[in-house]
Amino acid sequence: MTCSGAVPVFTGSSIRQPVCGSIHETRQLFLTGRSTVAAHVRNVLDAIRDTDPEIGAFVAVAGDGALREADAADRMIRTVGEAAFRERPLLGVPVSVKDLIQTRDLPTRRGSLLPNRRAAADAPAVARLRAAGAIVVGKTTTSEYGWSASTVNRLAGPTRNPWAPDRTAGGSSGGSAAAVAAGLCAASIGTDGAGSVRIPAAFCGVVGFKPSFARIPYVPPCADRLAHVGPLARSVADVADLMAVLTGPDQRDPDSSTGPLASRAAPASLRIGWLEFPGTSDEVRGVTEAVPSVLTGLGHRVERIEVPFADPYAALVDVVAAAEADGTAPEDEHLCDEGRLAVVRYGRSLTGAAVIRAEEVRMTLRATLAAVMERYDLLAMATVPIEPFDADAVAPPWAADPADLLWLAWSPATYPFNITGQPALSLPAGLTSRGLPVGLQLVGRPGDDDLVLRLAARVESELAHTMLPSGCESQGGR
Protein backbone atom coordinates (compact mmCIF):
# COMPACT_ATOMS: atom_id res chain seq x y z
CA MET A 1 0.00 0.00 0.00
CA THR A 2 1.76 3.14 -1.17
CA CYS A 3 1.33 6.12 1.12
CA SER A 4 0.92 9.65 -0.17
CA GLY A 5 1.21 12.91 1.71
CA ALA A 6 1.91 11.05 4.94
CA VAL A 7 4.06 11.78 7.96
CA PRO A 8 6.30 9.56 10.11
CA VAL A 9 4.52 7.49 12.73
CA PHE A 10 7.02 8.24 15.50
CA THR A 11 10.13 10.34 15.60
CA GLY A 12 13.03 8.06 16.43
CA SER A 13 10.93 4.89 16.41
CA SER A 14 12.72 1.64 15.65
CA ILE A 15 9.67 0.57 13.62
CA ARG A 16 9.56 2.81 10.55
CA GLN A 17 7.19 0.71 8.46
CA PRO A 18 3.65 -0.44 9.28
CA VAL A 19 3.66 -4.22 9.58
CA CYS A 20 -0.02 -4.74 8.73
CA GLY A 21 -1.62 -3.54 5.53
CA SER A 22 -5.24 -4.04 4.56
CA ILE A 23 -7.11 -7.32 4.89
CA HIS A 24 -6.80 -7.83 1.13
CA GLU A 25 -3.04 -7.19 1.23
CA THR A 26 -2.66 -9.58 4.14
CA ARG A 27 -4.46 -12.35 2.25
CA GLN A 28 -2.18 -11.75 -0.74
CA LEU A 29 0.89 -12.19 1.45
CA PHE A 30 -0.24 -15.70 2.27
CA LEU A 31 -1.71 -16.64 -1.11
CA THR A 32 1.44 -15.66 -3.00
CA GLY A 33 3.78 -17.26 -0.50
CA ARG A 34 5.51 -13.97 0.34
CA SER A 35 4.92 -14.72 4.00
CA THR A 36 3.64 -17.47 6.20
CA VAL A 37 0.95 -16.60 8.71
CA ALA A 38 3.32 -17.48 11.55
CA ALA A 39 6.03 -15.13 10.28
CA HIS A 40 3.55 -12.32 9.77
CA VAL A 41 1.98 -12.70 13.21
CA ARG A 42 5.44 -12.87 14.78
CA ASN A 43 6.32 -9.60 13.05
CA VAL A 44 3.10 -8.05 14.35
CA LEU A 45 3.80 -9.13 17.92
CA ASP A 46 7.37 -7.80 17.65
CA ALA A 47 6.07 -4.48 16.32
CA ILE A 48 3.57 -4.19 19.18
CA ARG A 49 6.36 -4.89 21.67
CA ASP A 50 8.73 -2.33 20.12
CA THR A 51 6.32 0.40 19.02
CA ASP A 52 3.28 0.33 21.27
CA PRO A 53 5.00 1.90 24.30
CA GLU A 54 5.03 5.09 22.22
CA ILE A 55 1.29 4.89 21.42
CA GLY A 56 -0.35 3.01 24.26
CA ALA A 57 -2.86 1.25 21.99
CA PHE A 58 -2.72 -2.19 23.65
CA VAL A 59 -3.56 -3.20 27.19
CA ALA A 60 -2.97 -6.96 26.67
CA VAL A 61 -1.12 -8.94 23.98
CA ALA A 62 -1.92 -12.52 22.94
CA GLY A 63 1.65 -13.86 22.54
CA ASP A 64 2.00 -17.64 22.32
CA GLY A 65 -1.71 -18.20 21.79
CA ALA A 66 -1.69 -16.10 18.64
CA LEU A 67 1.38 -17.95 17.34
CA ARG A 68 -0.31 -21.32 17.87
CA GLU A 69 -3.31 -20.12 15.87
CA ALA A 70 -0.95 -18.86 13.15
CA ASP A 71 0.73 -22.27 12.89
CA ALA A 72 -2.71 -23.90 12.53
CA ALA A 73 -3.60 -21.43 9.76
CA ASP A 74 -0.39 -22.27 7.90
CA ARG A 75 -1.19 -25.98 8.10
CA MET A 76 -4.63 -25.32 6.63
CA ILE A 77 -3.17 -23.26 3.77
CA ARG A 78 -0.60 -25.98 3.00
CA THR A 79 -3.33 -28.62 3.00
CA VAL A 80 -6.09 -27.01 0.91
CA GLY A 81 -4.47 -23.92 -0.63
CA GLU A 82 -6.70 -21.10 -1.83
CA ALA A 83 -9.83 -22.98 -0.76
CA ALA A 84 -8.85 -22.21 2.84
CA PHE A 85 -9.77 -18.56 2.28
CA ARG A 86 -13.18 -19.45 0.88
CA GLU A 87 -13.93 -21.45 4.00
CA ARG A 88 -12.36 -18.93 6.39
CA PRO A 89 -12.25 -15.51 4.69
CA LEU A 90 -10.14 -13.82 7.39
CA LEU A 91 -7.65 -16.67 7.71
CA GLY A 92 -4.45 -15.45 9.33
CA VAL A 93 -5.50 -11.79 9.49
CA PRO A 94 -4.23 -10.11 12.70
CA VAL A 95 -7.01 -8.24 14.50
CA SER A 96 -7.43 -6.55 17.86
CA VAL A 97 -10.41 -6.26 20.19
CA LYS A 98 -11.43 -3.31 22.37
CA ASP A 99 -11.07 -3.89 26.09
CA LEU A 100 -14.84 -3.55 26.61
CA ILE A 101 -15.54 -6.69 24.55
CA GLN A 102 -15.26 -10.09 26.22
CA THR A 103 -12.53 -12.53 25.21
CA ARG A 104 -12.04 -15.99 26.66
CA ASP A 105 -8.22 -15.96 26.52
CA LEU A 106 -7.38 -12.37 27.40
CA PRO A 107 -8.57 -10.27 30.36
CA THR A 108 -11.32 -7.71 29.85
CA ARG A 109 -10.43 -4.88 32.22
CA ARG A 110 -12.74 -2.24 30.67
CA GLY A 111 -10.01 0.35 31.05
CA SER A 112 -10.42 0.22 34.81
CA LEU A 113 -8.56 -0.56 38.01
CA LEU A 114 -11.80 -2.10 39.27
CA PRO A 115 -11.67 -5.89 39.61
CA ASN A 116 -12.99 -7.85 36.63
CA ARG A 117 -13.32 -11.59 36.14
CA ARG A 118 -12.07 -13.19 32.93
CA ALA A 119 -14.96 -14.05 30.61
CA ALA A 120 -15.86 -17.71 30.19
CA ALA A 121 -16.55 -17.24 26.47
CA ASP A 122 -15.88 -14.86 23.62
CA ALA A 123 -18.44 -12.19 22.78
CA PRO A 124 -20.30 -13.01 19.53
CA ALA A 125 -18.20 -10.60 17.45
CA VAL A 126 -14.96 -12.17 18.67
CA ALA A 127 -16.22 -15.72 18.19
CA ARG A 128 -17.25 -14.88 14.62
CA LEU A 129 -13.87 -13.33 13.84
CA ARG A 130 -12.10 -16.43 15.10
CA ALA A 131 -14.45 -18.72 13.19
CA ALA A 132 -13.54 -16.79 10.02
CA GLY A 133 -9.85 -17.41 10.73
CA ALA A 134 -8.80 -14.06 12.19
CA ILE A 135 -6.07 -14.10 14.83
CA VAL A 136 -6.64 -11.88 17.87
CA VAL A 137 -3.27 -10.32 18.71
CA GLY A 138 -4.41 -8.25 21.67
CA LYS A 139 -6.90 -6.09 23.54
CA THR A 140 -6.93 -2.35 22.85
CA THR A 141 -7.33 0.54 25.23
CA THR A 142 -10.51 2.39 26.13
CA SER A 143 -11.50 5.11 28.54
CA GLU A 144 -12.82 3.58 31.76
CA TYR A 145 -15.99 1.69 30.84
CA GLY A 146 -16.03 3.76 27.63
CA TRP A 147 -17.25 6.88 29.44
CA SER A 148 -15.41 9.53 27.37
CA ALA A 149 -14.53 10.30 23.77
CA SER A 150 -10.80 10.35 24.43
CA THR A 151 -8.77 7.38 25.61
CA VAL A 152 -7.12 8.20 28.91
CA ASN A 153 -7.43 5.99 31.98
CA ARG A 154 -5.63 5.14 35.21
CA LEU A 155 -4.99 1.59 34.03
CA ALA A 156 -2.88 2.41 30.97
CA GLY A 157 -2.51 6.19 30.71
CA PRO A 158 -3.22 8.06 27.44
CA THR A 159 -3.47 6.52 23.99
CA ARG A 160 -1.57 8.67 21.49
CA ASN A 161 -2.38 9.46 17.88
CA PRO A 162 0.05 7.77 15.43
CA TRP A 163 -0.09 10.88 13.24
CA ALA A 164 1.04 13.14 16.09
CA PRO A 165 1.90 11.49 19.42
CA ASP A 166 1.18 14.67 21.36
CA ARG A 167 -2.46 14.48 20.18
CA THR A 168 -5.30 12.23 21.30
CA ALA A 169 -6.39 9.20 19.32
CA GLY A 170 -9.98 9.97 20.32
CA GLY A 171 -12.22 7.49 22.08
CA SER A 172 -13.47 5.53 23.55
CA SER A 173 -12.20 3.00 20.95
CA GLY A 174 -8.97 4.98 20.73
CA GLY A 175 -6.69 1.97 21.09
CA SER A 176 -8.44 0.21 18.22
CA ALA A 177 -8.12 3.20 15.88
CA ALA A 178 -4.49 3.86 16.84
CA ALA A 179 -3.51 0.22 16.38
CA VAL A 180 -5.00 0.08 12.88
CA ALA A 181 -3.51 3.45 11.90
CA ALA A 182 -0.05 2.41 13.11
CA GLY A 183 -0.21 -0.88 11.20
CA LEU A 184 -0.15 -3.01 14.36
CA CYS A 185 -3.19 -4.98 13.20
CA ALA A 186 -5.21 -5.13 10.00
CA ALA A 187 -8.52 -4.42 11.72
CA SER A 188 -10.11 -4.00 15.12
CA ILE A 189 -13.50 -4.36 16.76
CA GLY A 190 -14.74 -1.49 18.90
CA THR A 191 -17.93 -0.30 20.52
CA ASP A 192 -19.85 2.90 19.84
CA GLY A 193 -22.34 4.36 22.33
CA ALA A 194 -22.17 8.00 21.23
CA GLY A 195 -19.44 8.03 18.57
CA SER A 196 -16.79 5.83 20.15
CA VAL A 197 -15.87 4.06 16.89
CA ARG A 198 -16.30 7.02 14.54
CA ILE A 199 -14.54 9.73 16.59
CA PRO A 200 -11.21 7.87 16.91
CA ALA A 201 -11.49 6.65 13.31
CA ALA A 202 -11.73 10.29 12.21
CA PHE A 203 -8.84 11.42 14.42
CA CYS A 204 -6.58 8.52 13.36
CA GLY A 205 -7.36 8.49 9.64
CA VAL A 206 -9.00 5.07 9.36
CA VAL A 207 -12.49 3.81 8.51
CA GLY A 208 -14.89 3.21 11.40
CA PHE A 209 -18.45 1.90 11.04
CA LYS A 210 -21.34 1.96 13.50
CA PRO A 211 -23.88 -0.31 11.83
CA SER A 212 -27.62 -0.20 12.38
CA PHE A 213 -28.62 -1.01 15.94
CA ALA A 214 -28.33 -4.75 16.72
CA ARG A 215 -26.87 -5.61 13.32
CA ILE A 216 -23.95 -7.08 15.30
CA PRO A 217 -25.00 -8.70 18.62
CA TYR A 218 -23.87 -6.92 21.79
CA VAL A 219 -23.31 -9.32 24.70
CA PRO A 220 -24.00 -8.66 27.48
CA PRO A 221 -26.69 -6.26 26.19
CA CYS A 222 -26.65 -2.62 27.31
CA ALA A 223 -29.74 -1.31 29.08
CA ASP A 224 -29.52 2.13 27.46
CA ARG A 225 -29.81 0.59 23.95
CA LEU A 226 -27.19 3.02 22.64
CA ALA A 227 -24.16 0.76 22.33
CA HIS A 228 -23.23 -0.79 18.99
CA VAL A 229 -20.36 -3.11 18.08
CA GLY A 230 -18.51 -1.87 15.01
CA PRO A 231 -15.35 -2.54 12.98
CA LEU A 232 -12.37 -0.27 12.29
CA ALA A 233 -10.08 -0.95 9.35
CA ARG A 234 -7.84 0.56 6.72
CA SER A 235 -10.47 0.74 3.94
CA VAL A 236 -14.20 0.58 3.28
CA ALA A 237 -13.69 -2.75 1.49
CA ASP A 238 -12.10 -4.16 4.64
CA VAL A 239 -15.04 -2.96 6.73
CA ALA A 240 -17.47 -4.61 4.29
CA ASP A 241 -15.51 -7.88 4.59
CA LEU A 242 -15.72 -7.67 8.36
CA MET A 243 -19.45 -6.92 8.31
CA ALA A 244 -20.06 -10.04 6.21
CA VAL A 245 -18.59 -12.06 9.06
CA LEU A 246 -19.94 -10.15 12.06
CA THR A 247 -23.65 -9.66 11.34
CA GLY A 248 -26.52 -11.92 12.33
CA PRO A 249 -28.67 -12.69 15.37
CA ASP A 250 -27.54 -14.20 18.66
CA GLN A 251 -30.05 -15.37 21.26
CA ARG A 252 -28.04 -13.70 24.05
CA ASP A 253 -28.90 -10.30 22.54
CA PRO A 254 -32.70 -10.20 22.06
CA ASP A 255 -32.50 -7.09 19.87
CA SER A 256 -30.27 -8.87 17.39
CA SER A 257 -33.01 -11.42 16.67
CA THR A 258 -35.06 -8.66 15.09
CA GLY A 259 -32.16 -6.84 13.45
CA PRO A 260 -32.56 -4.73 10.31
CA LEU A 261 -33.29 -6.22 6.92
CA ALA A 262 -30.94 -6.06 3.97
CA SER A 263 -30.59 -2.69 2.28
CA ARG A 264 -33.14 -1.64 -0.31
CA ALA A 265 -32.12 -1.19 -3.92
CA ALA A 266 -30.45 2.20 -4.30
CA PRO A 267 -31.43 4.70 -6.98
CA ALA A 268 -28.66 5.79 -9.34
CA SER A 269 -28.91 9.35 -8.05
CA LEU A 270 -29.14 9.68 -4.28
CA ARG A 271 -30.59 12.61 -2.35
CA ILE A 272 -27.95 13.64 0.18
CA GLY A 273 -28.33 16.20 2.96
CA TRP A 274 -25.10 18.04 3.84
CA LEU A 275 -24.80 19.28 7.44
CA GLU A 276 -22.26 21.57 9.08
CA PHE A 277 -22.35 21.81 12.86
CA PRO A 278 -21.66 24.99 14.86
CA GLY A 279 -18.08 25.17 16.05
CA THR A 280 -16.57 23.57 12.94
CA SER A 281 -12.95 24.70 12.78
CA ASP A 282 -11.46 26.38 9.74
CA GLU A 283 -9.02 23.46 9.39
CA VAL A 284 -11.81 20.87 9.28
CA ARG A 285 -13.92 23.01 6.95
CA GLY A 286 -10.93 23.42 4.66
CA VAL A 287 -10.79 19.64 4.20
CA THR A 288 -14.51 18.88 3.96
CA GLU A 289 -15.74 21.83 1.90
CA ALA A 290 -14.98 19.98 -1.34
CA VAL A 291 -17.05 16.92 -0.40
CA PRO A 292 -20.44 18.20 -1.70
CA SER A 293 -18.84 18.75 -5.12
CA VAL A 294 -17.38 15.24 -5.02
CA LEU A 295 -20.84 13.82 -4.28
CA THR A 296 -22.41 15.90 -7.04
CA GLY A 297 -19.72 14.68 -9.43
CA LEU A 298 -20.79 11.12 -8.64
CA GLY A 299 -24.28 11.97 -9.91
CA HIS A 300 -26.01 12.62 -6.59
CA ARG A 301 -28.15 15.58 -5.54
CA VAL A 302 -26.71 17.42 -2.55
CA GLU A 303 -28.59 19.98 -0.48
CA ARG A 304 -27.23 21.92 2.50
CA ILE A 305 -29.62 21.43 5.40
CA GLU A 306 -30.03 22.09 9.11
CA VAL A 307 -31.53 19.62 11.58
CA PRO A 308 -32.89 20.66 15.00
CA PHE A 309 -31.02 18.12 17.13
CA ALA A 310 -32.22 17.55 20.68
CA ASP A 311 -30.41 18.74 23.80
CA PRO A 312 -27.74 16.05 24.25
CA TYR A 313 -27.99 16.10 28.02
CA ALA A 314 -31.69 15.34 28.00
CA ALA A 315 -31.42 12.93 25.07
CA LEU A 316 -28.30 11.04 26.05
CA VAL A 317 -26.56 11.90 29.29
CA ASP A 318 -29.47 11.31 31.66
CA VAL A 319 -30.10 7.84 30.23
CA VAL A 320 -26.41 6.89 30.23
CA ALA A 321 -25.94 8.19 33.77
CA ALA A 322 -28.99 6.31 35.01
CA ALA A 323 -27.62 3.09 33.50
CA GLU A 324 -24.26 3.70 35.22
CA ALA A 325 -25.74 4.63 38.61
CA ASP A 326 -25.28 1.22 40.25
CA GLY A 327 -22.15 0.29 38.32
CA THR A 328 -19.67 1.01 41.12
CA ALA A 329 -19.90 0.28 44.83
CA PRO A 330 -19.10 3.27 47.07
CA GLU A 331 -16.16 1.41 48.62
CA ASP A 332 -14.57 1.06 45.15
CA GLU A 333 -14.92 4.70 44.12
CA HIS A 334 -11.26 5.44 44.91
CA LEU A 335 -10.32 3.17 41.98
CA CYS A 336 -12.41 5.08 39.42
CA ASP A 337 -11.49 7.80 36.97
CA GLU A 338 -12.91 11.08 38.26
CA GLY A 339 -14.86 11.72 35.07
CA ARG A 340 -16.66 8.40 35.12
CA LEU A 341 -17.28 8.74 38.86
CA ALA A 342 -19.00 12.07 38.19
CA VAL A 343 -21.30 10.26 35.76
CA VAL A 344 -22.08 7.55 38.32
CA ARG A 345 -22.89 10.12 41.02
CA TYR A 346 -25.05 12.13 38.68
CA GLY A 347 -26.94 8.98 37.75
CA ARG A 348 -27.65 8.26 41.41
CA SER A 349 -29.25 11.70 41.72
CA LEU A 350 -31.73 11.16 38.89
CA THR A 351 -35.37 10.42 39.57
CA GLY A 352 -37.47 7.97 37.60
CA ALA A 353 -39.42 10.90 36.19
CA ALA A 354 -36.20 12.48 34.88
CA VAL A 355 -35.26 9.29 33.06
CA ILE A 356 -38.74 9.07 31.52
CA ARG A 357 -38.44 12.68 30.33
CA ALA A 358 -35.08 11.84 28.79
CA GLU A 359 -36.64 8.92 26.93
CA GLU A 360 -39.35 11.25 25.62
CA VAL A 361 -36.63 13.56 24.24
CA ARG A 362 -35.01 10.56 22.56
CA MET A 363 -38.32 9.62 20.96
CA THR A 364 -38.71 13.17 19.66
CA LEU A 365 -35.23 13.05 18.13
CA ARG A 366 -36.04 9.73 16.45
CA ALA A 367 -39.18 11.26 14.96
CA THR A 368 -37.27 14.35 13.80
CA LEU A 369 -34.62 12.32 12.01
CA ALA A 370 -37.19 9.92 10.57
CA ALA A 371 -38.87 12.93 8.95
CA VAL A 372 -35.52 14.16 7.60
CA MET A 373 -34.77 10.73 6.17
CA GLU A 374 -38.08 10.79 4.30
CA ARG A 375 -36.54 13.56 2.18
CA TYR A 376 -32.96 12.28 1.95
CA ASP A 377 -31.40 8.90 1.26
CA LEU A 378 -28.27 9.75 3.24
CA LEU A 379 -26.72 12.52 5.31
CA ALA A 380 -23.09 13.66 5.09
CA MET A 381 -20.99 15.84 7.41
CA ALA A 382 -17.60 16.10 9.10
CA THR A 383 -17.40 13.32 11.69
CA VAL A 384 -15.79 15.62 14.26
CA PRO A 385 -15.75 19.41 13.77
CA ILE A 386 -12.34 19.93 15.42
CA GLU A 387 -8.80 18.56 15.17
CA PRO A 388 -7.39 16.11 17.74
CA PHE A 389 -6.45 17.87 20.99
CA ASP A 390 -3.83 17.12 23.66
CA ALA A 391 -3.23 13.40 24.28
CA ASP A 392 -3.37 13.73 28.07
CA ALA A 393 -6.73 15.54 28.08
CA VAL A 394 -10.26 14.15 27.98
CA ALA A 395 -11.58 17.23 26.16
CA PRO A 396 -10.23 20.37 24.48
CA PRO A 397 -9.40 23.15 26.97
CA TRP A 398 -12.46 25.23 26.13
CA ALA A 399 -14.83 22.39 27.12
CA ALA A 400 -15.15 23.66 30.65
CA ASP A 401 -15.67 20.53 32.74
CA PRO A 402 -14.88 17.18 31.10
CA ALA A 403 -16.43 15.38 34.06
CA ASP A 404 -19.81 16.55 32.78
CA LEU A 405 -19.49 14.55 29.55
CA LEU A 406 -18.67 17.66 27.58
CA TRP A 407 -17.34 15.63 24.66
CA LEU A 408 -20.85 16.34 23.38
CA ALA A 409 -19.82 20.01 23.08
CA TRP A 410 -16.94 19.21 20.73
CA SER A 411 -18.39 16.15 18.96
CA PRO A 412 -22.07 16.88 18.30
CA ALA A 413 -22.33 14.95 15.02
CA THR A 414 -22.12 11.38 16.27
CA TYR A 415 -24.40 10.79 19.28
CA PRO A 416 -27.75 11.44 17.50
CA PHE A 417 -27.32 8.34 15.35
CA ASN A 418 -26.82 6.10 18.36
CA ILE A 419 -30.19 7.27 19.62
CA THR A 420 -31.85 6.58 16.27
CA GLY A 421 -29.91 3.38 15.55
CA GLN A 422 -28.97 4.56 12.05
CA PRO A 423 -25.88 3.22 10.27
CA ALA A 424 -23.06 5.79 10.31
CA LEU A 425 -19.56 5.46 8.86
CA SER A 426 -16.49 7.68 9.17
CA LEU A 427 -13.93 7.58 6.38
CA PRO A 428 -10.82 9.70 5.84
CA ALA A 429 -11.54 12.97 4.03
CA GLY A 430 -7.99 14.35 4.00
CA LEU A 431 -5.39 16.09 6.13
CA THR A 432 -5.33 19.53 7.72
CA SER A 433 -2.47 21.96 7.12
CA ARG A 434 -0.84 20.46 10.22
CA GLY A 435 -1.01 16.97 8.74
CA LEU A 436 -3.83 15.71 10.99
CA PRO A 437 -6.63 13.49 9.64
CA VAL A 438 -10.20 14.69 9.19
CA GLY A 439 -13.13 12.29 8.91
CA LEU A 440 -16.23 12.40 6.73
CA GLN A 441 -19.38 10.81 8.18
CA LEU A 442 -22.06 9.21 6.00
CA VAL A 443 -25.39 8.29 7.63
CA GLY A 444 -28.18 6.16 6.20
CA ARG A 445 -31.67 5.09 7.16
CA PRO A 446 -31.98 2.25 9.69
CA GLY A 447 -31.16 -0.96 7.84
CA ASP A 448 -29.43 0.78 4.93
CA ASP A 449 -25.97 -0.36 6.01
CA ASP A 450 -25.10 -1.70 2.56
CA LEU A 451 -26.06 1.58 0.90
CA VAL A 452 -23.79 3.50 3.28
CA LEU A 453 -20.92 1.12 2.52
CA ARG A 454 -21.44 1.36 -1.24
CA LEU A 455 -21.43 5.17 -1.26
CA ALA A 456 -18.47 5.26 1.13
CA ALA A 457 -16.46 3.06 -1.23
CA ARG A 458 -17.17 5.41 -4.14
CA VAL A 459 -16.28 8.51 -2.13
CA GLU A 460 -13.14 6.83 -0.83
CA SER A 461 -11.94 6.17 -4.37
CA GLU A 462 -12.72 9.74 -5.44
CA LEU A 463 -10.90 11.33 -2.52
CA ALA A 464 -7.97 8.97 -3.20
CA HIS A 465 -6.34 9.55 0.18
CA THR A 466 -4.19 6.74 1.51
CA MET A 467 -4.44 7.49 5.20
CA LEU A 468 -1.49 5.62 6.65
CA PRO A 469 0.84 7.55 8.98
CA SER A 470 4.10 6.54 7.34
CA GLY A 471 5.97 7.55 4.22
CA CYS A 472 6.45 4.01 3.02
CA GLU A 473 4.76 0.76 2.00
CA SER A 474 3.24 -1.79 4.36
CA GLN A 475 5.47 -4.79 4.89
CA GLY A 476 4.90 -8.48 5.36
CA GLY A 477 7.50 -10.96 6.50
CA ARG A 478 8.79 -14.43 5.95
How would you label these PLM feature ranges?
Residues 121-246, 418-419, 423-432, 436-439:
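Short glycine/serine-rich loop segments
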Residues 89-110, 269-275, 319-370, 382, ...:
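Short helix-loop capping/hinge segments that flank enzyme active sites or metal/cofactor-binding pockets
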Residues 37-42, 71, 283-306, 328-331, ...:
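Acyltransferase
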